[in-house]
Amino acid sequence: GFLNHKEEIHVDSVKESKVYDLQFPLASISAPVLIDNIFYAFDKATLLPESKNALDSLILMLNENPNITIELSAHTDYRGAEAYNKTLSQKRAESVVKYLINHGIAPDRLTPVGYGEEKPKTIRRKVAERYPWLKENDVLTEEFILKLKPEQQETANALNRRTEFKVLRTTYNMFDKDGNLKNPPKKPVEN
């Protein structure tokens, strides 16, 4: 399945018929989705103001998909103690969840998880295209990163420091306590 997505197209007054080809990005619900541009204070869980647009986009997506629940995960690079990184990433995931709750998202739709350094990023096609020294399906483990040039190491570590979400359920609030569909489809009116 895919997440709901909405786009608008505005055209100036057109005097004749015209065909528009539109491509809509479809985010799969089976793979984690990276949330770009979420920034934290150094070595803290405090969200920086420049994260607002990305967080507000996440709120919009959750409002457009009212029946999903998500795991919100934060990740660190390998530097620092493993236990410390796990705690820091948990606090960061919780700070994102707190922001979402403060902006009207139901708490029971959100599960914060801090993975620390235990789930290094796997490189996908778009990232590999941006960084020619990475190949699709490379995994940014400590061992892999230490073989890179210093400037590449910093980029790889930055890619590991990320916030993602994945869909856990697609049936949130769809059924009553007896298992009946809350809003069944309306039957067509016969003439």
Question: What is each of the regions a protein language model found here?
Answer:
Residues 75-191:
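Periplasmic OmpA-like peptidoglycan-binding domain that tethers envelope proteins to the cell wall
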Residues 72:
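Conserved phosphate/oxyanion-binding catalytic-loop motifs
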Residues 1-69, 108, 168-191:
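Periplasmic peptidoglycan-binding/tethering modules of Gram-negative envelope proteins
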